[in-house]
Amino acid sequence: MTPQGNKPSSHDVITGRWTPSDADRAAGRVSGFGVITNIINGGLDC
């Protein structure tokens, strides 16, 4: 539920409090399920 390292809070993404930066948009990261999947599975979480 809290940001870790360079990953935003999944709660903030779900509730719309996170907005992608220009670098995020250029890399194809926009609010939605894909970003949440990357937050949860993008590191050593699973």
Curated annotation (Swiss-Prot):
Matches recorded under InterPro entries: Glyco_hydro_19_cat (IPR000726), Lysozyme-like_dom_sf (IPR023346)
Catalytic activity: Random endo-hydrolysis of N-acetyl-beta-D-glucosaminide (1->4)-beta-linkages in chitin and chitodextrins
EC number: 3.2.1.14
Region ranges (Disordered): 1-21
Family the UniProt entry places it in: Belongs to the glycosyl hydrolase 19 family. Chitinase class I subfamily.
Keywords recorded for this protein, A-Z: Carbohydrate metabolism, Chitin degradation, Chitin-binding, Glycosidase, Hydrolase, Plant defense, Polysaccharide degradation
Protein name as it appears in the record: Endochitinase 3
SUPFAM superfamilies recorded: Lysozyme-like
Organism: Arachis hypogaea
One example of a Gene Ontology biological process annotation: polysaccharide catabolic process
Job of this protein: Defense against chitin-containing fungal and bacterial pathogens.
Keyword Zinc-finger on entry: no
Induction (free text): Constitutively expressed at low levels.
GO molecular-function term, one example from the UniProt record: chitin binding
EC class name: hydrolase
